[in-house]
Amino acid sequence: MSTTDSGFVLYHYTPSKAAAIVFVVLFIIMTVIFAVQTLYAARKSSKALKNNPFESSDDKVDSLEDAEYKQLKITPTVFAFIPFFTGCIMEAVGYIGRALSSSNPERTTPYIIQSVLLLVAPALIAATIYMIFGRLLHVMRCQSLILISARFGTTFFVVGDVFSFFLQAAGGGLMSKAGSTKTGSGLITAGLFVQVIFFGFFIINEIRFTVNVKRRCLFYEDISRKWIFVNATLLLSSMLILLRSIVRIVEFIQGFNGYIISHEYFIYVFDAVPMLLVIIAFSVGSFFGNVFDVIKECQTLSN
């Protein structure tokens, strides 16, 4: 058991250095692989669309919907992955913190690094999931299939995600201060609840889209099935993060002497593994279909 001078228990065990290093390496490898895949896919699709009117800035548009549709270019979609890769890097750095803690479990700095970064990283990855789903809806012209206003659909989910992020980040910061641990834990729990609620609602919209896309997408019969792999990746990733967040909620409800926080295997089985699987799902899924291919196909068919 590792405690601070104030008596706060940092760890109920000595963190495993080997496990932490393994996940640092895995997160770095998968992040680099998927980053290369993303940039390659974006460049390939961008070249294919270079003579497409949707890539031109002086197009005449007949409606607001057309204007929004033509804004779905390749480059802005690449930017949507920035939160994803930021979250992946935070995961790796978080486990570096755990590796450092294994040598000196009483040090607060590595503890704070791993505690805060591993807590908030999934919220950044979730932001990319929301934005990619929004682009999928727009490019397939299926905005009407979600249960909120099409204009504010993506914004709604991203704002909720940002709110969750700041609640968890603030809570993580307070937990590192003597006398504020309960307040910090409460904020973290609230942030996780917000994340679960928004993810649950998001998954409902994902399923609604999947079930009804055939009758709503005007060029459904002409488009390839690459969008199915994109959608499946988003849905699987959402469920993995949802599972991870639910376990985290239980952890903080149990308190600092609870069973989950007292046993290290929970952080790996229900946090490290699900988040690594999210990156793997995106990487493997991109071989069968990525959002850039879907944008290219839909815009070509709509032209």
Swiss-Prot record:
Belongs to the lipid-translocating exporter (LTE) (TC 9.A.26.1) family. GO terms for biological process: heme transmembrane transport. Coiled coil: none annotated. Its main location: membrane. GO terms for cellular component: plasma membrane. It is found in: Cell membrane. Residues 40-76, 133-154, 205-226, 286-303 are cytoplasmic. It is a multi-pass membrane protein. InterPro entries: RTA1 (IPR007568). Involved in inducible protoporphyrin IX influx and heme efflux. It holds the Pfam family RTA1. Keywords: Cell membrane, Glycoprotein, Membrane, Transmembrane, Transmembrane helix. N-glycosylated. The chain crosses the membrane at residues 19-39, 77-97, 112-132, 155-175, 184-204, 227-247, 265-285. The keyword Transmembrane helix applies. It comes from the Eukaryota. This is Protoporphyrin uptake protein 1.
